[in-house]
Amino acid sequence: MSAMQLVDRIEKRRFVGREFLLWLWFESEVFEGTLSTKAHGQFGLWIARQIVLSLGKEEVTRIKGAYPAGTREAKESLLRGKTPETAGLHLSWHEHQATFVFKAEPMAISGLSLPTVLGEEEEEAPPPEARPKGRRGRKAEAQSDEGHEAFYERMRLTREVEEILEALYRDFLTLRLGAAWTDAVLPALSTWTDPEGEVDADAYRAARDRALSTRKR
């Protein structure tokens, strides 16, 4: 691969990453914070705490707050041609909650905040075969076991976050590379960015679901 081909690939990935983040923002508002994938069912996803939109290096808008994407300034930035480059996301699935920052251009997450809650099965698991120990030894071993359990639980939940994002990205690519992008997504996006517009969520959902149902396995 030549240097120019590598640069071209990087630039395309940056563009796709911004479109993906814009699509997540759009769907999270249209579906009122409840998204779904075939593999994971329904879960909560919305923008929280911060969003950064830009057009080139000079025109940058940074918005912070409980729900920055819902501000008038955020939508006006889109109308001026800016696209989201970074956003804080809140993910809620099953009994778990996670917050993190999604960076569109490298398509990566950072600052993952993931409270670790051990499941009942782990808490009630039978202890290893007892051995005579002093009080300090037993306490140290218990703390070590709890630390290991918390570590593996965090790793498991981190992977679940990644899998949900990967599933959403697959859905996005299916729409982006198919006729549904022009026929359904772009018109809905245009209506969504219009201050006077109102997206027909049911019609959009039906169109996107039809497109996703025809995806090749």
Question: Where do the protein language model's features map onto the residues?
Answer:
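Intrinsically disordered, low-complexity, charge-rich terminal extensions
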Residues: 1-217
